[in-house]
C-alpha cells in the first residue's frame, strides 16, 4: 500500500493534469508570455512528473522486494550458528576457543550479557536513523558469522559430516548473506535518488510543478479576474508543497 506522502505526490501530479485541461480549454486567451507557463511546457512538465512518480514506485518495489529477500536469507542464521557451536563443543577445541565461539554465537543470537534478545529492527521504518540502525545490525551479523567461520576453520577436528556445517557450505552461506545485504543497500540508494529526483521536479523553487501551478493560477487570475468563472474553476485545485 502506498504511504500517505506518496499518495500526496501523485495527487499533485494528477491535479496538475486537471489544471492543464482547464488552461487548454481557454483556447487562445491562455497565452502567457513566460515560456514555463505555456501549454507545451506544462505538458512536458506533467509528463516528466509522471515519469518521476513511476520511477519512485519502481524503486520502492525493488527496495521492498530485496528487503524481504534479505530477511529470508538471514532466517536460518541463528539455528545454523547454534548447530555450529554444538558441534564445536564436542571437538577437542580448547576452553578458550569454545568460550570465543560462545561469545560469537551469543552475538548472532542477539544475546548480550545482562540484556534481552535484540533482533535487527524491522524494515518498515522511513527515517534515516531507522535504516542506519537496521543496516548496522545486518552488517554486524554478517561480520560475526564471518568470524565464526574463521574460528572453526582454525580447528583441525572441526570436520562435520553434515553438509550444511562444512566450511564450504558455511562460506557459501556467508556469501549469500553479503549479497542479500548489498542488494538492499544498493536498492536503498536507488530509492533515495529516485525520491530526490522526483522532489526536484515537483518542488524545486520556481521551476517545480507546485510553484509552476501557482504561477499558472496567478496568470489566469490576472487575465480573467479574481471573480471570474475561469479563475474559480482552477483556484480550488489543490497543490501541496513538500513538508521540510
Which functions belong to the PLM regions below?
Residues 1-244:
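Basic/polar low-complexity intrinsically disordered segments
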Amino acid at each position: 500500500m502506498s504511504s500517505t506522502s506518496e499518495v500526496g505526490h501523485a495527487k499533485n501530479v494528477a491535479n496538475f493534469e486537471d489544471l492543464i485541461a482547464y488552461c487548454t480549454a481557454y483556447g487562445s486567451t491562455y497565452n502567457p508570455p513566460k515560456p514555463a507557463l505555456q501549454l507545451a511546457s506544462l505538458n512536458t512538465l506533467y509528463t516528466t512528473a509522471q515519469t518521476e512518480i513511476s520511477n519512485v514506485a519502481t524503486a520502492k518495489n525493488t527496495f521492498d522486494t530485496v528487503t524481504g529477500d534479505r530477511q529470508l536469507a538471514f532466517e536460518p542464521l541463528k539455528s545454523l550458528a547454534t548447530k555450529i557451536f554444538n558441534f564445536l563443543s564436542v571437538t577437542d577445541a580448547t576452553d578458550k576457543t569454545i568460550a570465543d565461539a560462545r561469545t560469537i554465537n551469543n552475538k548472532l543470537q542477539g544475546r548480550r550479557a545482562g540484556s534481552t534478545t535484540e533482533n535487527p529492527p524491522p524494515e518498515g521504518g522511513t527515517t534515516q536513523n531507522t535504516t542506519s540502525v537496521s543496516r548496522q545490525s545486518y552488517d554486524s551479523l554478517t561480520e560475526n558469522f564471518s568470524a565464526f567461520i574463521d574460528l572453526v576453520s582454525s580447528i583441525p577436528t572441526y570436520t562435520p559430516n553434515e553438509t550444511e556445517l562444512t566450511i564450504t557450505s558455511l562460506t557459501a552461506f556467508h556469501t549469500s548473506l553479503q549479497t542479500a545485504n548489498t542488494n538492499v543497500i544498493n536498492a536503498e540508494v536507488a530509492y533515495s535518488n529516485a525520491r530526490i529526483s522526483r522532489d526536484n521536479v515537483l518542488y524545486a523553487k520556481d521551476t517545480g510543478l507546485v510553484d509552476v501551478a501557482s504561477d499558472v493560477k496567478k496568470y489566469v487570475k490576472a487575465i480573467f479576474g479574481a471573480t471570474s468563472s475561469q479563475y474559480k474553476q482552477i483556484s480550488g485545485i489543490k497543490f501541496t508543497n513538500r513538508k521540510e
